[in-house]
UniProtKB/Swiss-Prot annotation:
Residues binding Fe cation, per UniProt: H107, H111, Y128, D285
Protein name: Probable bifunctional tRNA threonylcarbamoyladenosine biosynthesis protein
Record-level Gene Ontology MF annotations: ATP binding; iron ion binding; metalloendopeptidase activity; N(6)-L-threonylcarbamoyladenine synthase activity; protein serine kinase activity; protein serine/threonine kinase activity; protein serine/threonine/tyrosine kinase activity; zinc ion binding
Organism expressing this protein natively: Picrophilus torridus (strain ATCC 700027 / DSM 9790 / JCM 10055 / NBRC 100828 / KAW 2/3)
Pfam families: RIO1, TsaD
Length: 529
């Protein structure tokens, strides 16, 4: 099967041709603004001017003609409206002229599938970082799911904005990477991770302030990279634990950054995962990735009438079925958490687990020590207060020098393991009661996923290191949002589970509708919703 793919979501117009085995050609032209960032209409003018030449060269390089095609695929979204309209119009014109079937493709799906094609990865979790996107994506229950993402600006956008403050034209990320190599001092920047989601606007504001104070520019660039990259690699590692998968795929324009690539490699090596780093040429937006995704969709039954190919600027990857992937959950985490190593033992005759937070080699040592100590102290205090509800194990000892917590051992199954084999409405109600009790004390968990809930004779919460005492209403809504998203992603009957949870939780919490509105606001901050 021979497929032409046309990409044009942002700054790059590209045409690529693939078959089942290889990439036959890939030709691109990138719009570079004279000043500032990308101007959508100017980029669209560039695309309209270059698209004929890009398509012609792609056919010439492949030694093919339009008549040889079996399918035309184009990037339907997400992206900049004027740019998307140029590429979709060209794709429709080719489809009509040569009587070829047409498919609109989700742009992030293209990044996943070209990465899999080039690397041989089977069922990876993808860390996708570009100018507009920062997402952790995994295939679960028939389609790709967004497990975590930025709640404001993309990481690449943040780097480009700061580069403009330095007087560096677009694209500024590569220059920041070079400047960071000469940085030494780690400046304190907000480390903004909430559960599986991240935020970069606060980091940008703080970096801009350091610039106004006259701090060394190389040090600011170094700190900007170390902090923001550590955040996304941490969320990626948590996603690996959360899904039990063992393959990592790195993609997107920012994935060309050598420091980010080394951090992902270090994390994978230390944790026993396989890391696949997309070839730098194909990290950038390209037509071949759209062709590859379109081919897989078509081979698995996807068809679109031309009237169904309207662009969608807010097109999310989790809207697209992906039946060609077989989920492979092959890693057991009985002796480790996302950030810890667990060993069983005794403490003065009591059965306990020793939870150690080891160094993370991918992080700057100064940042790593700060995060580990803060998280461990926070976990100790929250577990202490939460134990009063009966829904947390006892913490017997806190060794801040060796970074070890000694915790009562609970015999039971995580919620994730429990619901793999059966569905129990009563257990959902027990979980809802326990969560309501925790929130009633104004305690938030901070990472309320099925791997951090143990089902035994009652419900226990573990790993509260990202939670809050005297928490805000939004902290509570964040807990619920993360738990609901986990249920929808991990379980076929996730929506039914949420319904039963809500019914029970609302009995124990005043004005649950208020929290539902907060959850909607949190969801609205995600990209393309």
């Amino acid at each position: 099967m021979i497929v032409l793919g046309l990409e044009g979501t942002a700054h790059t117009i590209s045409a690529g041709i693939v078959d089942e085995k290889s990439i036959l050609s890939n030709v691109s032209s990138t719009y570079v603004p004279e000043h500032g960032g990308i101007h959508p209409r100017e980029a669209a003018v560039h695309h309209a001017d270059k698209i004929y030449d890009v398509i012609k060269r792609s056919f010439d390089n492949a030694g093919l003609k339009p008549e040889d095609l079996d399918l035309i695929a184009f990037s339907m979204g997400p992206g900049l409206g004027p740019c998307l309209r140029v590429v979709s119009t060209a794709a429709r014109a080719l489809s009509i002229k040569y009587s070829k079937p047409l498919l609109g493709v989700n742009h992030p799906l293209g990044h996943v599938e070209i990465g899999r094609k080039l690397s041989g990865a089977r069922d990876p979790i993808m860390l996708y970082i570009s100018g507009g996107n920062t997402q952790v994506i995994a295939h679960l229950n028939g389609r790709y799911r967004v497990l975590g993402e930025t709640m404001d600006i993309g990481l690449g956008n943040m780097l480009d904005k700061f580069a403009r403050d330095l007087g560096i034209p677009f694209p500024g990320g590569p220059v920041i990477e070079r400047m960071a190599l000469d940085g030494k001092d780690l400046l304190e920047l907000p480390y903004s991770v909430k559960g599986m989601d991240t935020s970069f606007s606060g980091i940008y504001t703080a970096a801009k302030r350091y610039l106004s104070l006259g701090k060394n520019k190389n040090d600011i660039c170094y700190s900007l990279q170390e902090t923001s990259f550590s955040m996304v690699v941490e969320v990626l590692e948590r996603a690996m634990y959360y899904t039990n998968k063992n393959e990592i795929l790195l993609a997107g324009g920012v994935a060309r950054n050598d420091r980010l690539r080394s951090m992902v490699n270090d994390m994978a090596r230390d944790s026993g995962y396989k890391a696949y780093l997309t070839d730098k040429e194909y990290c950038m937006d390209n037509g071949a990735m759209i062709a590859q995704a379109g081919m897989l969709m078509y081979m698995h039954g996807a068809r679109q009438d031309i009237m169904e190919t309207r662009i969608n600027q807010r097109f999310r990857i989790d809207e697209v079925p992906a039946p060609w992937i077989k989920d492979e959950n092959s890693i057991s985490f009985k002796d480790k958490g996302a950030e810890s190593i667990i060993t069983n033992g005794e403490f003065y005759g009591r059965s306990v687990v020793f939870k150690k937070r080891p160094e993370k080699s991918y992080r700057d040592k100064r940042l790593d020590l700060k995060i580990r100590l803060e998280r461990m102290k926070n976990e100790f205090y929250i577990m202490y207060y939460l134990h009063k509800t009966g829904n947390a194990p006892i913490v017997y000892d806190f060794d801040r020098f060796d970074m070890v917590l000694t915790i009562e051992r609970i015999n039971g199954l995580t919620m994730n393991d429990y619901f793999k084999s059966k569905y129990d409405e009563n257990v959902i109600r027990m979980i809802a009661d326990a969560v309501a009790k925790m929130h009633g004390l104004r305690i938030s968990h901070g990472d309320l996923t099925p791997n951090n809930i143990i089902i035994s004779d009652k419900i226990y919460f573990i790993d509260t290191s990202m939670g809050h005492l005297r928490c805000s209403d939004e902290d509570i809504a964040d807990d619920l949002f993360l738990l609901y998203e986990s249920m929808k992603s991990l379980y076929v009957n996730g929506h039914e589970m949420i319904k039963h949870f809500e019914n029970e939780y609302s009995k124990n919490v005043e004005d649950y509708n208020y929290y539902k509105e907060l959850i909607k606001k949190i969801e609205s901050r995600r990209r393309y919703v």
